[in-house]
From Swiss-Prot:
Keyword GTP-binding: no
Lipidation (S-diacylglycerol cysteine): 33
Family as reported in the entry's similarity comment: Belongs to the AlgK family.
Biased amino acid composition, Acidic residues: 471-484
Organism for this UniProt entry: Pseudomonas putida (strain ATCC 47054 / DSM 6125 / CFBP 8728 / NCIMB 11950 / KT2440)
Designated name of the protein: Alginate biosynthesis protein AlgK
Membrane topology (UniProt): Lipid-anchor
InterPro entries, per the entry: Alginate_biosynth_AlgK, Sel1-like, Sel1_AlgK, TPR-like_helical_dom_sf
Signal sequence segment: 1-32
SMART domains: SEL1
Gene: algK
Protein backbone atom coordinates (compact mmCIF):
# COMPACT_ATOMS: atom_id res chain seq x y z
CA UNK A 1 0.00 0.00 0.00
CA UNK A 2 1.37 3.44 -0.89
CA UNK A 3 2.22 5.84 1.92
CA UNK A 4 -0.20 8.46 0.55
CA UNK A 5 -3.08 6.05 1.06
CA UNK A 6 -2.75 6.16 4.81
CA UNK A 7 -5.06 9.05 5.61
CA UNK A 8 -7.12 7.49 8.39
CA UNK A 9 -4.90 8.69 11.22
CA UNK A 10 -6.25 10.77 14.05
CA UNK A 11 -5.33 14.41 14.52
CA UNK A 12 -4.29 13.50 18.04
CA UNK A 13 -1.43 11.40 16.75
CA UNK A 14 -0.46 14.14 14.27
CA UNK A 15 -0.11 16.62 17.10
CA UNK A 16 1.70 14.26 19.46
CA UNK A 17 4.30 13.12 16.99
CA UNK A 18 5.79 15.73 14.72
CA UNK A 19 6.57 13.41 11.85
CA UNK A 20 5.40 13.12 8.27
CA UNK A 21 2.29 11.10 7.56
CA UNK A 22 4.23 8.17 6.12
CA UNK A 23 6.56 7.80 9.12
CA UNK A 24 3.71 8.13 11.60
CA UNK A 25 1.58 5.58 9.79
CA UNK A 26 4.48 3.16 9.70
CA UNK A 27 5.07 3.52 13.42
CA UNK A 28 1.41 2.90 14.25
CA UNK A 29 0.32 0.27 11.73
CA UNK A 30 3.67 -1.50 11.67
CA UNK A 31 3.14 -2.55 8.07
CA UNK A 32 5.59 0.18 7.13
CA UNK A 33 6.94 1.89 4.05
CA UNK A 34 10.36 0.70 2.97
CA UNK A 35 13.11 1.78 5.34
CA UNK A 36 10.81 2.87 8.19
CA UNK A 37 10.79 1.27 11.66
CA UNK A 38 8.58 -1.80 11.87
CA UNK A 39 8.00 -3.81 15.06
CA UNK A 40 6.59 -6.86 13.30
CA UNK A 41 9.64 -6.92 11.06
CA UNK A 42 11.85 -6.60 14.13
CA UNK A 43 10.06 -9.45 15.91
CA UNK A 44 10.37 -11.75 12.90
CA UNK A 45 14.02 -10.80 12.32
CA UNK A 46 14.85 -11.60 15.95
CA UNK A 47 13.18 -15.01 15.73
CA UNK A 48 15.24 -15.97 12.69
CA UNK A 49 18.48 -14.71 14.25
CA UNK A 50 18.92 -11.44 12.33
CA UNK A 51 19.66 -9.34 15.40
CA UNK A 52 21.13 -6.44 13.41
CA UNK A 53 17.86 -5.81 11.52
CA UNK A 54 15.81 -6.36 14.66
CA UNK A 55 17.96 -3.93 16.65
CA UNK A 56 17.68 -1.18 14.02
CA UNK A 57 13.89 -1.36 13.99
CA UNK A 58 13.51 -1.71 17.75
CA UNK A 59 15.82 1.25 18.34
CA UNK A 60 13.94 3.49 15.94
CA UNK A 61 10.65 2.73 17.68
CA UNK A 62 12.21 2.88 21.15
CA UNK A 63 13.48 6.38 20.36
CA UNK A 64 9.85 7.34 19.66
CA UNK A 65 8.99 6.20 23.19
CA UNK A 66 7.32 2.85 22.54
CA UNK A 67 7.87 0.75 25.66
CA UNK A 68 7.44 -2.60 23.92
CA UNK A 69 10.16 -1.70 21.43
CA UNK A 70 12.36 -0.69 24.36
CA UNK A 71 11.78 -4.18 25.77
CA UNK A 72 12.76 -5.76 22.45
CA UNK A 73 15.93 -3.68 22.31
CA UNK A 74 16.85 -4.68 25.85
CA UNK A 75 16.19 -8.35 25.03
CA UNK A 76 18.84 -8.16 22.32
CA UNK A 77 21.33 -6.65 24.77
CA UNK A 78 20.66 -9.43 27.29
CA UNK A 79 21.17 -12.07 24.59
CA UNK A 80 24.73 -10.82 23.99
CA UNK A 81 25.63 -11.94 27.56
CA UNK A 82 28.04 -9.00 27.62
CA UNK A 83 28.02 -7.59 31.20
CA UNK A 84 28.08 -3.98 29.98
CA UNK A 85 25.18 -4.66 27.59
CA UNK A 86 23.24 -6.41 30.34
CA UNK A 87 23.72 -3.37 32.58
CA UNK A 88 22.26 -1.18 29.82
CA UNK A 89 19.39 -3.64 29.40
CA UNK A 90 18.58 -3.42 33.11
CA UNK A 91 18.30 0.36 32.84
CA UNK A 92 16.11 0.05 29.73
CA UNK A 93 13.78 -2.48 31.35
CA UNK A 94 13.55 -0.30 34.43
CA UNK A 95 12.56 2.73 32.35
CA UNK A 96 9.85 0.76 30.54
CA UNK A 97 8.55 -1.09 33.62
CA UNK A 98 6.32 1.80 34.69
CA UNK A 99 3.99 1.14 31.75
CA UNK A 100 4.91 -2.33 30.50
CA UNK A 101 4.12 -5.60 32.34
CA UNK A 102 6.49 -7.34 29.93
CA UNK A 103 9.30 -5.04 31.09
CA UNK A 104 8.41 -5.84 34.71
CA UNK A 105 8.72 -9.56 34.01
CA UNK A 106 12.00 -9.10 32.11
CA UNK A 107 13.51 -6.93 34.85
CA UNK A 108 12.43 -9.41 37.49
CA UNK A 109 14.05 -12.29 35.60
CA UNK A 110 17.21 -10.28 35.05
CA UNK A 111 17.52 -9.50 38.75
CA UNK A 112 17.06 -13.18 39.62
CA UNK A 113 20.00 -14.02 37.37
CA UNK A 114 22.15 -11.09 38.49
CA UNK A 115 25.44 -12.19 40.11
CA UNK A 116 26.09 -10.84 43.60
CA UNK A 117 22.59 -9.37 43.83
CA UNK A 118 21.67 -7.42 46.95
CA UNK A 119 18.82 -8.20 49.32
CA UNK A 120 16.96 -5.16 47.93
CA UNK A 121 17.35 -6.43 44.36
CA UNK A 122 16.06 -9.88 45.32
CA UNK A 123 13.02 -8.35 47.01
CA UNK A 124 12.47 -6.13 43.97
CA UNK A 125 12.64 -9.18 41.71
CA UNK A 126 9.99 -10.93 43.80
CA UNK A 127 7.70 -7.89 43.66
CA UNK A 128 8.13 -7.42 39.90
CA UNK A 129 7.51 -11.07 39.07
CA UNK A 130 4.40 -11.20 41.25
CA UNK A 131 3.06 -8.00 39.65
CA UNK A 132 3.74 -9.30 36.15
CA UNK A 133 2.04 -12.61 36.95
CA UNK A 134 -1.10 -10.81 38.16
CA UNK A 135 -1.18 -8.94 34.83
CA UNK A 136 -1.12 -12.16 32.85
CA UNK A 137 2.57 -12.37 31.96
CA UNK A 138 3.88 -15.88 31.43
CA UNK A 139 7.27 -17.21 32.52
CA UNK A 140 7.11 -15.66 35.96
CA UNK A 141 6.63 -18.54 38.40
CA UNK A 142 9.74 -20.49 37.41
CA UNK A 143 11.99 -17.44 37.96
CA UNK A 144 10.20 -16.91 41.28
CA UNK A 145 10.92 -20.51 42.22
CA UNK A 146 14.55 -20.00 41.21
CA UNK A 147 14.72 -16.93 43.41
CA UNK A 148 13.41 -18.81 46.45
CA UNK A 149 15.65 -21.81 45.79
CA UNK A 150 18.75 -19.69 45.16
CA UNK A 151 18.43 -17.44 48.18
CA UNK A 152 16.47 -19.18 50.95
CA UNK A 153 18.16 -16.92 53.50
CA UNK A 154 16.62 -13.89 51.76
CA UNK A 155 13.10 -15.33 52.02
CA UNK A 156 13.03 -17.23 55.33
CA UNK A 157 9.22 -17.30 55.43
CA UNK A 158 8.93 -19.00 52.03
CA UNK A 159 9.03 -22.77 51.71
CA UNK A 160 9.72 -23.40 48.02
CA UNK A 161 8.04 -26.82 47.92
CA UNK A 162 4.92 -25.54 49.70
CA UNK A 163 4.76 -22.55 47.35
CA UNK A 164 5.01 -24.82 44.30
CA UNK A 165 2.30 -27.08 45.77
CA UNK A 166 0.02 -24.04 46.08
CA UNK A 167 0.69 -23.03 42.47
CA UNK A 168 -0.06 -26.57 41.28
CA UNK A 169 -3.26 -26.73 43.34
CA UNK A 170 -4.36 -23.47 41.73
CA UNK A 171 -3.84 -25.01 38.29
CA UNK A 172 -1.07 -22.66 37.19
CA UNK A 173 0.47 -24.14 34.01
CA UNK A 174 4.01 -23.13 35.02
CA UNK A 175 3.84 -24.86 38.39
CA UNK A 176 4.73 -28.30 37.06
CA UNK A 177 7.93 -27.01 35.51
CA UNK A 178 8.75 -25.22 38.74
CA UNK A 179 8.55 -28.64 40.40
CA UNK A 180 10.95 -30.07 37.80
CA UNK A 181 13.36 -27.22 38.53
CA UNK A 182 13.17 -28.00 42.24
CA UNK A 183 14.11 -31.63 41.55
CA UNK A 184 17.10 -30.50 39.50
CA UNK A 185 18.17 -28.06 42.18
CA UNK A 186 17.89 -30.55 45.02
CA UNK A 187 19.70 -33.26 43.07
CA UNK A 188 16.65 -35.56 43.12
CA UNK A 189 15.81 -35.42 39.41
CA UNK A 190 16.73 -39.06 38.80
CA UNK A 191 14.47 -40.19 41.64
CA UNK A 192 11.48 -38.44 40.04
CA UNK A 193 11.82 -39.31 36.35
CA UNK A 194 8.28 -40.68 36.29
CA UNK A 195 6.77 -37.45 37.60
CA UNK A 196 8.94 -35.34 35.27
CA UNK A 197 7.65 -37.42 32.35
CA UNK A 198 4.03 -37.02 33.48
CA UNK A 199 4.37 -33.25 33.97
CA UNK A 200 6.04 -32.67 30.64
CA UNK A 201 3.81 -34.95 28.59
CA UNK A 202 0.83 -32.94 29.80
CA UNK A 203 2.53 -29.62 29.02
CA UNK A 204 4.28 -30.55 25.77
CA UNK A 205 1.87 -28.81 23.40
CA UNK A 206 2.01 -25.52 25.28
CA UNK A 207 5.53 -25.55 26.76
CA UNK A 208 8.15 -26.68 24.27
CA UNK A 209 10.97 -26.77 26.84
CA UNK A 210 9.35 -30.09 27.75
CA UNK A 211 10.90 -31.61 24.63
CA UNK A 212 14.26 -31.18 26.36
CA UNK A 213 13.06 -32.62 29.66
CA UNK A 214 11.38 -35.62 28.04
CA UNK A 215 14.44 -36.27 25.87
CA UNK A 216 16.51 -36.23 29.06
CA UNK A 217 14.18 -38.70 30.79
CA UNK A 218 14.20 -41.12 27.86
CA UNK A 219 17.97 -40.81 27.49
CA UNK A 220 18.51 -41.60 31.16
CA UNK A 221 16.16 -44.59 30.98
CA UNK A 222 17.51 -45.86 27.68
CA UNK A 223 14.01 -45.81 26.14
CA UNK A 224 14.91 -45.66 22.45
CA UNK A 225 11.36 -46.16 21.13
CA UNK A 226 9.92 -43.35 23.24
CA UNK A 227 12.85 -41.13 22.26
CA UNK A 228 12.27 -41.82 18.57
CA UNK A 229 8.58 -40.97 18.88
CA UNK A 230 9.42 -37.75 20.71
CA UNK A 231 11.92 -36.75 18.02
CA UNK A 232 9.26 -37.36 15.38
CA UNK A 233 6.94 -34.96 17.21
CA UNK A 234 9.76 -32.44 17.52
CA UNK A 235 10.59 -32.51 13.81
CA UNK A 236 6.93 -32.11 12.90
CA UNK A 237 6.48 -29.22 15.32
CA UNK A 238 9.60 -27.49 13.99
CA UNK A 239 8.46 -27.94 10.38
CA UNK A 240 5.17 -26.16 11.07
CA UNK A 241 6.84 -23.39 13.08
CA UNK A 242 5.49 -24.45 16.47
CA UNK A 243 8.95 -25.00 17.97
CA UNK A 244 11.96 -22.67 17.55
CA UNK A 245 15.33 -23.78 16.23
CA UNK A 246 16.88 -23.14 19.63
CA UNK A 247 14.71 -25.88 21.13
CA UNK A 248 15.81 -28.38 18.48
CA UNK A 249 19.42 -27.43 19.28
CA UNK A 250 18.85 -28.12 22.98
CA UNK A 251 17.36 -31.56 22.28
CA UNK A 252 20.28 -32.41 19.98
CA UNK A 253 22.69 -31.60 22.79
CA UNK A 254 20.80 -33.97 25.10
CA UNK A 255 21.23 -36.75 22.55
CA UNK A 256 24.99 -36.14 22.50
CA UNK A 257 25.46 -35.89 26.27
CA UNK A 258 27.39 -38.93 27.52
CA UNK A 259 26.47 -38.18 31.12
CA UNK A 260 22.82 -38.97 30.36
CA UNK A 261 23.32 -42.47 28.99
CA UNK A 262 23.72 -44.02 25.53
CA UNK A 263 24.30 -41.23 23.01
CA UNK A 264 22.76 -40.83 19.57
CA UNK A 265 25.27 -38.46 18.02
CA UNK A 266 24.24 -39.16 14.42
CA UNK A 267 20.66 -38.06 15.05
CA UNK A 268 22.01 -35.07 16.97
CA UNK A 269 24.05 -34.07 13.93
CA UNK A 270 21.05 -34.42 11.62
CA UNK A 271 18.96 -32.17 13.86
CA UNK A 272 21.68 -29.53 14.13
CA UNK A 273 22.36 -29.48 10.40
CA UNK A 274 18.66 -28.92 9.81
CA UNK A 275 18.40 -25.87 12.07
CA UNK A 276 21.87 -24.29 11.80
CA UNK A 277 21.02 -22.05 8.80
CA UNK A 278 18.23 -20.48 10.89
CA UNK A 279 20.06 -20.61 14.22
CA UNK A 280 23.75 -19.61 13.99
CA UNK A 281 24.49 -20.95 17.48
CA UNK A 282 23.90 -24.44 16.09
CA UNK A 283 27.07 -24.16 13.98
CA UNK A 284 28.94 -24.10 17.28
CA UNK A 285 26.89 -27.01 18.58
CA UNK A 286 27.92 -28.91 15.45
CA UNK A 287 31.55 -28.01 16.08
CA UNK A 288 31.27 -29.22 19.66
CA UNK A 289 29.64 -32.43 18.42
CA UNK A 290 32.49 -33.15 15.99
CA UNK A 291 34.99 -32.31 18.75
CA UNK A 292 33.31 -34.79 21.11
CA UNK A 293 32.77 -37.44 18.43
CA UNK A 294 35.70 -37.20 15.96
CA UNK A 295 34.23 -39.96 13.80
CA UNK A 296 31.53 -37.49 12.69
CA UNK A 297 33.99 -35.23 10.85
CA UNK A 298 37.63 -34.32 10.35
CA UNK A 299 39.54 -31.26 11.52
CA UNK A 300 38.60 -29.30 8.39
CA UNK A 301 34.91 -29.91 9.10
CA UNK A 302 35.37 -28.91 12.74
CA UNK A 303 37.11 -25.67 11.80
CA UNK A 304 34.48 -24.90 9.14
CA UNK A 305 31.76 -25.08 11.78
CA UNK A 306 33.80 -22.92 14.17
CA UNK A 307 34.39 -20.35 11.41
CA UNK A 308 30.65 -20.13 10.72
CA UNK A 309 30.03 -19.65 14.41
CA UNK A 310 32.63 -16.90 14.64
CA UNK A 311 31.20 -15.19 11.55
CA UNK A 312 27.90 -15.06 13.43
CA UNK A 313 29.70 -13.64 16.49
CA UNK A 314 28.88 -16.62 18.70
CA UNK A 315 30.94 -16.52 21.94
CA UNK A 316 30.85 -20.31 22.21
CA UNK A 317 32.86 -20.46 18.98
CA UNK A 318 35.59 -18.36 20.59
CA UNK A 319 35.47 -20.61 23.64
CA UNK A 320 35.89 -23.80 21.62
CA UNK A 321 38.68 -22.33 19.49
CA UNK A 322 40.48 -21.18 22.64
CA UNK A 323 40.16 -24.68 24.07
CA UNK A 324 41.67 -26.20 20.93
CA UNK A 325 44.73 -23.94 21.21
CA UNK A 326 44.88 -24.59 24.97
CA UNK A 327 44.80 -28.39 24.65
CA UNK A 328 47.09 -28.66 21.62
CA UNK A 329 45.52 -31.85 20.25
CA UNK A 330 43.40 -30.90 17.24
CA UNK A 331 45.46 -27.73 16.65
CA UNK A 332 49.08 -26.99 17.64
CA UNK A 333 49.26 -25.72 21.21
CA UNK A 334 49.48 -21.93 21.32
CA UNK A 335 48.97 -20.32 24.73
CA UNK A 336 48.82 -16.77 23.37
CA UNK A 337 46.12 -17.60 20.82
CA UNK A 338 44.29 -19.58 23.48
CA UNK A 339 44.35 -16.57 25.80
CA UNK A 340 43.10 -14.27 23.02
CA UNK A 341 40.07 -16.39 22.12
CA UNK A 342 39.27 -17.35 25.70
CA UNK A 343 39.33 -13.71 26.79
CA UNK A 344 36.90 -12.85 24.00
CA UNK A 345 34.60 -15.64 25.16
CA UNK A 346 34.89 -14.66 28.83
CA UNK A 347 34.09 -11.03 28.08
CA UNK A 348 30.95 -12.21 26.29
CA UNK A 349 29.82 -14.16 29.34
CA UNK A 350 31.07 -17.71 28.70
CA UNK A 351 31.77 -19.05 32.20
CA UNK A 352 33.90 -21.98 31.03
CA UNK A 353 36.32 -19.54 29.40
CA UNK A 354 37.26 -18.28 32.86
CA UNK A 355 38.15 -21.83 33.86
CA UNK A 356 40.58 -22.32 30.98
CA UNK A 357 42.08 -18.85 31.47
CA UNK A 358 42.59 -19.67 35.13
CA UNK A 359 44.38 -22.88 34.20
CA UNK A 360 46.57 -21.03 31.69
CA UNK A 361 47.73 -18.67 34.43
CA UNK A 362 47.92 -21.35 37.16
CA UNK A 363 50.12 -23.61 35.07
CA UNK A 364 52.30 -20.84 33.67
CA UNK A 365 51.59 -21.70 30.04
CA UNK A 366 52.32 -18.08 29.04
CA UNK A 367 55.81 -18.23 30.55
CA UNK A 368 55.20 -17.46 34.21
CA UNK A 369 52.75 -18.59 36.86
CA UNK A 370 50.31 -15.73 37.54
CA UNK A 371 48.51 -16.81 40.72
CA UNK A 372 46.29 -13.76 41.20
CA UNK A 373 44.96 -13.92 37.65
CA UNK A 374 44.44 -17.65 38.12
CA UNK A 375 42.46 -17.13 41.32
CA UNK A 376 40.32 -14.36 39.79
CA UNK A 377 39.32 -16.42 36.75
CA UNK A 378 38.90 -19.74 38.55
CA UNK A 379 36.75 -18.12 41.22
CA UNK A 380 34.58 -16.50 38.52
CA UNK A 381 34.19 -19.92 36.89
CA UNK A 382 33.43 -21.69 40.17
CA UNK A 383 30.83 -19.13 41.22
CA UNK A 384 29.31 -19.42 37.76
CA UNK A 385 28.73 -23.14 38.24
CA UNK A 386 31.91 -24.68 36.76
CA UNK A 387 32.54 -27.37 39.37
CA UNK A 388 35.98 -28.35 38.05
CA UNK A 389 37.15 -24.82 38.91
CA UNK A 390 36.73 -25.59 42.61
CA UNK A 391 39.13 -28.51 42.33
CA UNK A 392 41.60 -26.34 40.40
CA UNK A 393 41.43 -23.71 43.17
CA UNK A 394 42.00 -26.41 45.78
CA UNK A 395 45.08 -27.54 43.85
CA UNK A 396 46.36 -23.97 43.51
CA UNK A 397 46.14 -23.20 47.23
CA UNK A 398 47.44 -26.65 48.17
CA UNK A 399 50.46 -26.74 45.84
CA UNK A 400 51.40 -23.10 46.32
CA UNK A 401 52.95 -22.55 42.89
CA UNK A 402 53.82 -18.85 42.86
CA UNK A 403 52.14 -18.31 46.23
CA UNK A 404 52.49 -19.56 49.80
CA UNK A 405 50.46 -22.77 50.35
CA UNK A 406 47.17 -22.04 52.13
CA UNK A 407 45.70 -25.35 53.29
CA UNK A 408 42.64 -23.65 54.81
CA UNK A 409 41.63 -22.10 51.49
CA UNK A 410 42.50 -25.35 49.72
CA UNK A 411 40.18 -27.24 52.10
CA UNK A 412 37.31 -24.82 51.38
CA UNK A 413 37.45 -25.40 47.63
CA UNK A 414 38.10 -29.11 47.99
CA UNK A 415 34.90 -29.28 50.03
CA UNK A 416 32.99 -27.32 47.37
CA UNK A 417 34.31 -29.62 44.65
CA UNK A 418 32.50 -32.54 46.32
CA UNK A 419 29.24 -31.35 44.75
CA UNK A 420 30.45 -33.50 41.84
CA UNK A 421 33.28 -35.52 43.36
CA UNK A 422 36.07 -37.29 41.54
CA UNK A 423 38.61 -39.74 43.02
CA UNK A 424 41.28 -37.03 42.73
CA UNK A 425 39.24 -34.36 44.53
CA UNK A 426 38.20 -36.81 47.26
CA UNK A 427 41.83 -37.82 47.82
CA UNK A 428 42.96 -34.19 48.02
CA UNK A 429 40.22 -33.40 50.55
CA UNK A 430 41.30 -36.35 52.68
CA UNK A 431 44.90 -35.13 52.66
CA UNK A 432 43.86 -31.61 53.62
CA UNK A 433 41.62 -32.90 56.42
CA UNK A 434 44.71 -34.42 58.04
CA UNK A 435 46.77 -31.22 57.69
CA UNK A 436 44.43 -28.74 59.39
CA UNK A 437 44.62 -27.96 63.09
CA UNK A 438 41.30 -27.49 64.95
CA UNK A 439 41.69 -23.69 64.80
CA UNK A 440 42.46 -23.82 61.07
CA UNK A 441 39.43 -26.07 60.57
CA UNK A 442 37.13 -23.61 62.35
CA UNK A 443 38.42 -20.70 60.28
CA UNK A 444 38.10 -22.72 57.09
CA UNK A 445 34.54 -23.71 57.98
CA UNK A 446 33.62 -20.04 58.36
CA UNK A 447 35.11 -19.30 54.93
CA UNK A 448 33.21 -22.24 53.46
CA UNK A 449 29.91 -21.00 54.89
CA UNK A 450 30.64 -17.52 53.57
CA UNK A 451 31.42 -18.82 50.08
CA UNK A 452 28.26 -20.93 50.02
CA UNK A 453 26.18 -17.89 50.91
CA UNK A 454 27.85 -15.91 48.14
CA UNK A 455 26.93 -18.55 45.61
CA UNK A 456 23.34 -19.14 46.65
CA UNK A 457 21.77 -22.59 46.55
CA UNK A 458 21.16 -23.23 42.86
CA UNK A 459 24.41 -25.03 42.12
CA UNK A 460 22.86 -28.10 40.53
CA UNK A 461 19.87 -26.55 38.79
CA UNK A 462 21.10 -23.14 37.68
CA UNK A 463 22.71 -24.24 34.44
CA UNK A 464 19.95 -26.56 33.27
CA UNK A 465 18.20 -25.60 30.04
CA UNK A 466 14.98 -25.12 32.00
CA UNK A 467 16.61 -22.70 34.43
CA UNK A 468 18.51 -20.73 31.81
CA UNK A 469 15.54 -20.29 29.52
CA UNK A 470 13.27 -19.33 32.39
CA UNK A 471 15.42 -16.22 32.72
CA UNK A 472 15.21 -15.35 29.03
CA UNK A 473 12.47 -14.09 26.76
CA UNK A 474 9.46 -16.35 26.33
CA UNK A 475 9.15 -16.72 22.57
CA UNK A 476 5.48 -17.63 22.89
CA UNK A 477 4.59 -14.28 24.43
CA UNK A 478 2.36 -12.09 22.32
CA UNK A 479 4.41 -9.73 20.22
CA UNK A 480 4.25 -6.13 21.25
CA UNK A 481 2.81 -4.56 18.10
CA UNK A 482 -0.79 -4.60 19.32
CA UNK A 483 0.06 -2.37 22.26
CA UNK A 484 1.78 0.29 20.21
Amino acid sequence: MACEGRTMISDTYKVRVNLGLCALAAAITLAGCAGLPDQRLANEALKRGDTALAERNYKALADLGYSEAQVGLADIKVATRDPSQIKEAEATYRAAAATSPRAQARLGRLLVAKPDSTQAEREEAETLLKQAAKQGQSNTLIPLAMLYLSYPQSFPKVNAQQQIDQWRAAGNPEAGLAQVLLYRTQGTYDQHLGEVEKICKAALNTTDICYVELATVYQKRGQADQQAALLGQLKSAYARGAVPATRVDSVARVLADRSLGQTDEKTAKELLEQVAPANPASWVSLAQLVYDFPELGDTDQLMAYIDKGREAEQPRAELLLGRLYYEGKTLPADAQKAEQHLQAAAEAGEISAHYYLGQLYRRGYLGNVEPQKAVDHLLAAARGGQNSADYALAQLFSEGHGIRPQPGNAWVFAQLSQANPTPQSAELLQQLDQQLTPDQRNQAQQLLDQEKRARGSLAQGANSTLALEALQDDEKEVDGEDSL
